[in-house]
Amino acid sequence: MSDQNLDIQQDHQKYVESLGDWARTNTCGELNANAIGSEVCLMGWVQFRRDHGGLIFIDLRDRSGLTQVVFSPDVSVDAHERAHVLRSEYVLAVRGTVRPRPEGMVNPNMKTGEVEVYVSEWKLLNTSKTPPFQVEDRVEASENLRLEYRYLDLRRPRLARNFQLRHRATQAIRNYLDQLNFLEVETPYLTKSTPEGARDFLVPSRMNQGEFYALPQSPQIFKQLLMVAGMDRYYQIVRCFRDEDLRADRQPEFTQVDIEMSFVDEERVQSMAEGLMARVFKETLGIDVALPFPRMPYDQAIAEYGLDKPDTRFDLRLKDVTDILRGSGFRLFAKAELVKAMRVPGGAVLSRKEIDDFTEFVKVYGAQGLAWIKIKEDEWQSPIAKFLSDDERAALTTELGLETGDIVFFQAASPDVVNNSLGYLRLKVADRFGLIPENSYNFLWVTDFPLFEYSPEDKRYVACHHPFTAPQVGHEELMVSDPAKARARAYDLVLNGNEVGGGSIRIHSREAQEHMFRALGFDPQEAEEQFGFLMQALELGAPPHGGIAFGMDRLVMLLAGSASIRDVIAFPKTQKATCLMTHAPDQVAAKQLRELGIRLREKQEA
C-alpha cells in the first residue's frame, strides 16, 4: 500500500459514523422490479465506484450479491458531494429509493439488474486500506496470498455462494435424518490414541503429565458404543483429524457426516444413504437423482476401471490381455505379472508430445513407461509393433474391438502399478478428449471389498477399512487361513470418480472382534489394552449395527463444481498443514511447556 493511499484512508477515518438506529431493510442481492418505489436501507462493501455524467455509481456488495446505488445531486447534494471519498472495500450504509434502470441499462447477469437505488443519505461505517488483491471472482492473486488474507478472499461472490450452498446441504442432511428419527449426539474430541489408522494428533495432558489425548480420526468406536447404549439411530456432523501427508484434496482437519444404525444390514444402510443424497441434491441444486444407485463389486471396479472409485460417466474400460501376450516377443509383456490395455477410440490423433506427457504422468503411479499402438489404415504404428505376431494382433483386435484411428495404451507390471497407472490415465485421457459430460452426477456403490490388504511397510495384513468391519458370512475362517481372499461387509459410495462416503456392517460380538485382532497380528494383551473397553461393551448385549460416513467437504466441493476442496472450507490449511493467516502451528511459551511437563530437545539432538 502506497504512503499516498494510506494517507487517504487515514484522512477518511474522520468521516466514519456509528450505525446508530439505522436498520437494514434488504440485502444487496434481493431487490427486483417488484421493489420499485420502495424506500430501502442497504449495507455492505463498496465493490466498484464509477463517476459518470455528474453521477456517482457504486456497486454495493454483501454475501447475497450486488446492488447498484446511485449518488445524484438531484436527489441529495450532500450525499453526492461526500460520495467522492468512497473507495473499494469501504463499509457503507445507504438509504434511498428503488428505481428502474434506464432503458438499455438493464443487466441480465445480475439478480438486481433491473433496478438501482438512488441514495438520499448514507453513512460511512468503516474505511479500508487498499486490499492486497481485488475482491472479485476473476482474481489474479496467488492462492498463498489469498489464504493469508482469507477473510478478504471469502468476500468473493463465488466463495460466498459456496458457503451458502454448504449451509443448505447441512440443513438438508439434518432435516432428512431428523425425519427418520435419528438423534444428533456429540462424541468426545479428547480421546484415546489407537493404532490401525493414520497418525493421530496428540494433545498433552497437564493434569496427567506424560500422558496424551488424541484428536479423533473418526468417532468410529464411540458411535458403536452408542448403538450398544440403545441410541438406535445416531448421526453427527463432526470434525475429524488426521496427521498424514496431504494431497491436494486432503486437509488435516475435515468434516464428516457420521451415521450409525442398529438392527440393519447393508441394504438398509444404503437405502437410507441414497435417500439422503437425493434430498441434498434436490434442495441444493434442484436435481432429481435416480434411485436406487447401481452396485459394482470391488473386483469388477479394479478389473475394468483400475480404481476402487470408478468414474462411470464415460465408457473407457481396461482389458486384461496377459494371456494373449504371454508368449510375446516383447519381453516386458511376456514376463509381466499383469498386462492390461485401454483402447481410446479416435485416439490416433494424439501427438508424440502428448503421448510423452502421458508417459511421464503414469510414472507418478510407479510405472516405468507407457507402451502404445496407433491403429492406422495400413499399419500398426508403434515402437513395439514389430514384436507382435499376426496371431497376437488378431487376438488384440478381437478382444479390444480395435478400429482404424484408435490408439491402445498398455501397462505391464505388478497389479497395483498396472491398475493405478492405467486407472488414472483413463481419467486424464477422458479429459483430453472431452468424454466427461458436464453437469452429470453418476452415483455408484462399490461393494464386496477385501477385508484385508497387505502392507509392504508393516510386512503384514492390515484392515482395508478398519478393524471393526464384519467379514462376509462364511469368510470368518479365511481371515486366518487365506486373508487375501476374505471379503468385508463394506461399501463405498462413489460420485463421479470421487469417494464421498464409506461404511460397513460392524462386528458386534467379543469373540468375533478378538478373532479379527488375531487375524491382524495383535497380541491379546495389546488388544485388551487398546480396545478392552469396546470388547467389554460387546459382551453386554450389543445389537447388530452398521453405518456410513460421508466426507462433507468433498461432497460440497462436487455440489459447487469447484476444483479444490479448499474452496468449500472457511479457513483451510496448506499442503504443509499450515495456516498462512494465523501462522499456525507456532512455538509456544516455555511456561506452557513446563506446565505440561514437556521439554523440547535441540534439533541436533533429535
UniProtKB/Swiss-Prot annotation:
It is an enzyme of class 6 (ligase). It is found in: Cytoplasm. InterPro entries: Aa-tRNA-synt_II (IPR004364), aa-tRNA-synth_II (IPR006195), aa-tRNA-synth_II/BPL/LPL (IPR045864), Asp-tRNA-ligase_1 (IPR004524), Asp-tRNA-ligase_1_N (IPR047089), Asp/Asn-tRNA-synth_IIb (IPR002312), AspRS_core (IPR047090), GAD-like_sf (IPR004115). The keyword Nucleotide-binding applies. It catalyses: tRNA(Asx) + L-aspartate + ATP = L-aspartyl-tRNA(Asx) + AMP + diphosphate. Keywords: Aminoacyl-tRNA synthetase, ATP-binding, Cytoplasm, Ligase, Nucleotide-binding, Protein biosynthesis. Pfam families: GAD (PF02938), tRNA-synt_2 (PF00152), tRNA_anti-codon (PF01336). ATP binds at R242, D243, E244, Q251, E499, G551, M552, D553, R554. PROSITE patterns: AA_TRNA_LIGASE_II (PS50862). GO terms for biological process: aspartyl-tRNA aminoacylation. L-aspartate binds at E196, R242, H465, R506. GO terms for molecular function: aspartate-tRNA ligase activity; aspartate-tRNA(Asn) ligase activity; ATP binding; nucleic acid binding. One of its GO terms (cellular component) is cytoplasm. CDD domains: AspRS_core, EcAspRS_like_N. The record marks H52, G104 as: Important for tRNA non-discrimination. Its EC number is 6.1.1.23. Residues 220-223 are annotated as: Aspartate. Disulfide bonds: none annotated. NCBIfam families: aspS_bact (TIGR00459), PRK00476.1 (NF001750). Aspartyl-tRNA synthetase with relaxed tRNA specificity since it is able to aspartylate not only its cognate tRNA(Asp) but also tRNA(Asn). Reaction proceeds in two steps: L-aspartate is first activated by ATP to form Asp-AMP and then transferred to the acceptor end of tRNA(Asp/Asn). Homodimer. Belongs to the class-II aminoacyl-tRNA synthetase family. Type 1 subfamily. This is Aspartate--tRNA(Asp/Asn) ligase. It comes from Oleidesulfovibrio alaskensis (strain ATCC BAA-1058 / DSM 17464 / G20).
